Amino acid sequence: MSSTLERARTAVATSPELRRLVERGRAILLGPSDEALRQEQDESHWQPAVAAGSRWWQAALSALSGVVGATVIAASAPRWRLAVPSWRLSIPGIAQPGNSTQSTMWFLLGLILIGLGWLGLVYRAGRIADPRRAVVVVGAVIALWAIPVSLGPPLLSNDVYSYVAQGEMASRGIDPSSVGPVELGRNDFTSGADPVWRSAPAPYGPVAVMAARSAVELAGHDQVAAINFYRLIVWIGVVMAAIGIGMIAVGNGLSAAVAIAIGIGNPIMILHIIGGVHNDAIMFGFLALGLAAAQRDKKKLAVALIAAATAVKLPAAVGLLYLGWCWRGAIATWKERVVTTVAVFASSIAAIVVGCFFVGLGPGWITALTSTGKVNDTYSPTTKLGFSIAEILNGVGLDVNGQLLASGVRALGLLATAAIAFVMLMRSPRVGYIKATGVMLVAYVLLGPVIWPWYLVTGFALLAACGLGRYRPSYLVVCLAASWFVWPTSVVSMGTVGSGYQHLRGLGVVVLVITLAWGAQRFAARWERRYHGLSTTEREAAVSSELAEVDSTC
């Protein structure tokens, strides 16, 4: 046996092809080499040079663009047709329109303005010399953008009506994980809940249900007031997330202002998380603070915070997995890693069970997660691919069950997600549990059965706090594109517009986004190869000479 191993080692050592193959396999499973990690770290830690002048007008212009865009979207957003109309869910002095076409056109204009403002904010955040001042400026601009979308009706989603209905159920002693809001009978809470979820149990944990119950009870069981109280809870979650992302970025030697601008100031966060009043903000806040605490070696506090995030939405549990695996550092044995991971999960499960008992929540919220996978009109690549193949086959005369085919492709996507989870588990001692958590959250969303824009925020923001490096252009493109995936037509996915070959057209949109991200990446790489390392004066001179050459040839 030993002689066979020796011959294998000799063959690998003497064959460049075999050596490259072994190194590639090792990099896939265990991560890049120390030299590659140092190179990636240098690229991730690169920050743009601070401009000589303050140029506050650029920051002001970005802030103005974003606030105008947010105001346009909030002022033109239609009310949820099944909710009881109330002036308390509108911008004072502005009547909410009922025309979805008009709302959509204003939405597109507003989204362009917010997108431009966001890109400008990211650009300026890295060019303010004082780090503390940069964080204050970025935080103030994001808060300014969030105010208009917090005054109008809930944007681009009706989920908050279901949240407060579940909170009303919990306040009456009804378990929202076993029955849907229809159990409340006829009232404002039931009528406001989306018919899709009116009979469905809540797929949210005890912390989410307790937050909804608190909002309802503070509001005196008034539906509209409960929504506004829930908005306040979402704001608290966003602030927690911003603090956590900033702390993680500083711990990684990066600019907190840039990380917050990218991860918290993006259009998805402003329009979908804050404007749509999603409980993902609560999960995000606890998870970001927990990972930041672990980074500062406060691991028991980290487990408590990440367990709280898991008690909002179950996907946050990946943070527990990678934290437990990396608990004892890079030189721990497999046995030590398994023991600490089991201990982390056991303590977290015990805490969540106690929370469920306190709130009066059964285990149905875990099994209720499968109900979200029944939605087919999202931009999940696996869902679109399965239904698109069925549409093509049906178009040529073959009778194919699209739902069955899509289920098969979704299963393959989940298998790929499990494979990525294992690879990141092996890599996590080298790349870090924070980056591993971010990668896994993004992979789970992209390969899962359902994608809504607000699902992407948490993973993307964690990656931004770890340093996007050369991947920043594709990140910005995907984040901007995902903001367009839902239109304000109470609520209509962009893929449902028009008729015929709906899923095939949706798959085309996904392919277009991937192509644009790839193109932005290639363009930025070319630009970096040509101009990176030059001083500002040299870079401007190089660009000017190229423009002069173009003018001379025209």
Residue ranges and their predicted role:
Residues A242, M283-K298, L441:
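Specific aromatic-rich, kink-prone transmembrane helix
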